[in-house]
């Protein structure tokens, strides 16, 4: 369910821009911009409780999936722009290129095994589209008819290299129906914006993991890997 208009999304992202320009955001971040209409249309199909997996460029997705904008701004303001997540809303992100499709496929498998009516939505860039991890995840989802939809957010740029630069052509691979693609032009540079910010002040703003996750469970050091066991099975870790 899309919760914001195009204008509102831009205004929320502008708050991050203004904070950076005011020298109060000395961290790496990746701004969204130029794909508001496409994302609003997609999130109108996403239900509360559906699983959403996103890349390092994730602010719009977080807003549209119901994460409080103040929480997003707080996380971004403390250097966690690339790692936004909300376990209760089943929202996860990762900065590892091509690192989330296989996780999304695994969650979709667990949902199918549990008979859940929830669905997985996995957003990747056209750089991650080039990875073997994505190919394997797509093949597994398609072959097993899993409730997972991959969305390629294609701005024709992987960091600063176009498809032509990477492959010698701009040919688009033809994926099965579990993969959709939308094309857009990114409004901002790959990371940050083209203005100076004093990175030396980062320690004044950054919170510790203990401050963010006060109830984070501490696990004992594993001395013998053969004796190690997980408290939860994979299916138990995925809620219905």
Region roles according to the model:
Residues 12-14, 41, 240:
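Short, hydrophobic/amphipathic alpha-helical patches that form generic packing surfaces
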């Amino acid at each position: 369910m899309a919760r914001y208009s195009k204008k509102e999304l831009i205004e929320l992202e502008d708050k991050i821009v203004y904070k950076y320009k005011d020298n109060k955001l000395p961290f790496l971040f990746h701004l969204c911009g130029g794909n508001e209409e496409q994302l609003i249309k997609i999130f109108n199909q996403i239900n509360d409780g559906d699983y959403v997996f996103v890349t390092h460029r994730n602010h719009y997705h977080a807003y549209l999936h119901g994460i409080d904008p103040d929480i997003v701004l707080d996380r971004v303001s403390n250097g966690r722009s690339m790692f936004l997540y909300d376990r209760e809303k089943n929202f996860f992100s990762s900065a590892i290129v091509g690192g989330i499709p296989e996780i999304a496929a695994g969650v979709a498998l667990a949902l199918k095994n549990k008979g859940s009516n929830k669905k997985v939505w996995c957003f990747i860039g056209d750089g991650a589209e080039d990875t073997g991890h994505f190919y394997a995840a797509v093949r597994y989802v398609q072959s097993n008819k899993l409730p997972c939809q991959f969305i390629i957010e294609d701005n024709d740029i992987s960091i600063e290299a176009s498809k032509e630069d990477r492959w010698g052509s701009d040919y688009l691979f033809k994926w099965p129906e579990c993969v959709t693609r939308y094309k857009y032009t990114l409004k901002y540079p790959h990371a940050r914006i083209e203005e100076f910010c004093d990175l030396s002040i980062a320690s004044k703003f950054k919170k510790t993991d203990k401050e963010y996750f006060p109830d984070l469970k501490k696990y004992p050091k594993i001395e013998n890997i053969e004796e190690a066991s997980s408290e939860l099975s994979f299916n138990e870790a995925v809620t219905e």
